[in-house]
Amino acid sequence: ILNRCCNDDN
């Protein structure tokens, strides 16, 4: 998990 901005829906 790296810099995930908006889509944490992955």
From Swiss-Prot:
Subcellular location: Secreted
Name this protein carries in UniProt: Toxin To33
Source organism: Tityus obscurus
Transmembrane annotation, as ranges: none
GO CC list: extracellular region
Keywords assigned by UniProt, alphabetized: Secreted, Toxin
GO MF terms held by the record: toxin activity
Tissue: Expressed by the venom gland.
